[in-house]
Amino acid sequence: NFGLGLDYILMALAPDITWLFAGRVISGIASSSFSTAGAYIADVTPPEERAAGFGMIGAAFGLGFVLGPAVGGLLGASDPRLPFWGAAATSLVNACYGFFVLPESLPRDKRMSFSWKWANPIGSLVLLRSHHELFSLAAVAFLGYLAHAVLPSTAVLYVGYRYGWGSTAVGFMLAAAGINAMIVQGLLMKPLTARFGERNTLFAGLCCGAIGFCVYGFATEGWIYCAGIPIMAFWGLAGPSAQGLMTNRVSASEQGQLQGAIAGLSGIASLIGPGLFTQTFALFIGPRAGWRLPGAPFLLASLLLLLGMTLAWRATRGAR
């Protein structure tokens, strides 16, 4: 959070685009908030409740997805740099709270000593090879992250191209997605995992995601696309369930390393996904397209989730 705060300060002061890139680099180097939060939840919750805890992170993200653009718009109306100052202040307050107030999650005897071999991008990923089921579940998570990349990279282009939506309609779409995500991950995640188990909620989430992407891809009207938003929200069951299953396969001292590895997979997917989906979109709407299919990126994302379901079935046989 300190690095993120510094990033926003640089963007608020930026006289040119070079400063913006510098801020983004600092943010990327210090981007451990989600992995640290995941490790903390794994440390302080019993195994059977971890998926629900991870779901709360998703619910918080959904809340930010709703409130962030609204607050940023209000602040930016008076000064375009003010939203960055507000974001910097929020990040730094969060960092101070974590450092001075939040207690340590592990007793000293369960902590793992620091090693520089974990300080490289590959070191933490080695843990994923320590167990066959863990590696397969990590592959499921990676496919989910890769499929998710279609939304920030292509969704706005798609709805503008196919339905003629402007910024206002897109804003309502994003708000609806955030609200639905909050409901599923914040309210439904815990009772559903308690009733059906993490394995079943993982499959249900992947199935809903695959169906939702098909709805998006084949939607000929904007209202049909919107009808897919609640279905897609239940995809939010998959990520926390997969994380919960993975945390049960490593020791208490390895939870932070595991969350770092998961964050690494997310970063790799973020490198590959935008280019993959935007090029697919361009290919299927371009003049050389033999079959004009604007929704092709979403259908590709659906196939990735179906592949993830296959891997998850093989990895979790016998698990609840």
In which residue ranges do the predicted regions lie?
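Juxtamembrane intracellular "pre-TM" segments in multi-pass secondary transporters
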Residues: P103-V140, R162
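Multi-pass alpha-helical transporter architecture, strongest
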Residues: A95-V101, L299-R320
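Short amphipathic helix-loop junctions that connect adjacent transmembrane helices
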Residues: S153-V170
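Helix-to-loop junctions at the C-terminal end of transmembrane segments
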Residues: V184-E198
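Helix-breaking motifs and short loop linkers at transmembrane-helix boundaries and internal kinks
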Residues: L13-T18, A30, G164, F218-T220
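A membrane-interface helix-boundary motif in multi-pass transporters
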Residues: G76-A89, Q279-L305
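Structural signature of the two symmetry-related core transmembrane helices
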Residues: N1-L10, N200-V215
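Cytoplasmic helix-loop-helix junction between adjacent transmembrane helices
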Residues: G23-G62
